[in-house]
Amino acid sequence: INKKSKNIYRKRPYKKNFFLFGLLFGFGFYLSGISWITNSLTFDNNFRVLIPFALILIPLILSLFMAFTIFIIGPFLKYNLQSLFIFSGSLAFSDYLRSKVLTGFPWNMWAYSTNWMVEFIQISNTIGLNAYNLIVITLFTSPIIIFYKNNSIKKLFSALLIVFTILTLFIYGNFEINRNKILLANIEKKIFVKVISPNFDLKYGLSENEIEQRFKKLIRYSDPDKNKKTLFIWPEGVFSGY
């Protein structure tokens, strides 16, 4: 093999490597994102044997969606803006398929990582979760523009486009929040919703006194107000032992 052909080989990895890269990245992505599901198997000692399978097999199976996606689009990706959109769109479509195949498994979507930014997620009410997920993936992968082989002007334009998108999401979300507050202020009959998340340990065989104490804590955490019609949502786990 001469030097020239060796350089070409290094720049063009085997397709199976794309599959492997996607599989490993997907496994780490889902392992870190849904490892919490094993907590439900610690409740009963009979289920503890399933923890290794839930911890390893579920992320591994889900990572196949990402592996096949990277396997298909990997050979066509380059250091340009078009490839960024192809990559982001393909991952978003992969998430969409994952939410539909075999009754659907729409967990750990990229968009969920922004649920703490109330202003940003408002747009999902208008364009839908999957479209918003596409925007989030594009923003997360946008730092790749620093490796583009384009001139500085095109890189600057791409960076400004990203900043503009972020500002637009924030401004729109802030507008929607304020608009909803005004609408709620003009509504006389309201029903409030309060989600309660106590830190009870799940136990069976509780005594009557323990059950009573648990109810008292739930009521205290709920902090009901007689002047407000409120729907309280308690997690099903709080009724363990009843």
Question: What residue ranges belong to the model's regions?
Answer:
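Membrane-embedded alpha-helical bundles of multi-pass enzymes
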Residues: I1-I182
